[in-house]
A protein has these predicted regions:
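P-loop (Walker A) phosphate-binding loop of NTP-binding proteins
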Residues: 8-9
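Conserved P-loop NTP-binding catalytic core
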Residues: 1-5, 18-70, 75-76
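Electropositive, glycine-dotted interaction segments
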Residues: 69-168
Length: 168
């Protein structure tokens, strides 16, 4: 997609869609300097319930004719869950899933066997994935073998461009 245009009336949420897309891109690519840095998520503040709920984000995209779905559940401090699935057939295959364990204050990552990632590389990525950092951002800063994660990381780094929006 070379260009996209969003139409709508004033105050209908057009800029919020663009802000969410840019936030998602930065969540995938940016590695926080330390574990105490906020994730940057801003909850919906107009009702009491939403203020205290986690934000859920999901994006479907295609790379080399394969469908991927990347999902996050996060709040201002932690990424509570993150999953990446690929559709090489009609059924989804898990490339990884990550959950935050509040008892140990750490993330647990399960890599799918289809990813073909060595145990050493899995440990490296897991060690680099702090609570406010996506698995893909940690992968991008890790010296590990080439896998489908390269395709996804490179897609966000080279194909998904900065969003141009009013005030951005």
């Amino acid at each position: 997609l070379k260009i996209g245009i969003i139409y709508g009336t004033n105050a209908s949420g057009k800029t919020n869609i663009l802000n969410a897309m840019e936030f998602f891109r930065m969540l995938v690519l940016s590695m926080p300097k330390d574990r105490n840095k906020k994730t940057g998520v801003v909850p919906f503040l107009l009702d009491e319930t939403s203020r205290n709920e986690k934000t859920k984000m999901s994006m479907s995209f295609y790379i080399n004719k394969l469908k991927y779905i990347l999902s996050f559940e996060l709040d201002s401090k932690y990424i509570h869950s993150e999953t990446l699935f690929v559709y090489e057939s009609i059924r989804p295959t898990k490339l990884y899933s990550r959950t935050y364990d509040s008892n140990t204050d750490s993330s647990v990552i399960e890599f799918g066997s289809n990813l073909k990632l060595s145990k050493k590389s899995q440990d490296t990525i897991s060690g680099n994935t702090i609570n406010n950092c996506s698995v893909l951002a940690a992968f991008g800063k890790s010296n590990v073998e080439k896998t489908k994660l390269n395709d996804v990381y490179d897609y966000f780094a080279m194909q998904v461009k900065d969003v141009l929006a009013p005030g951005m």
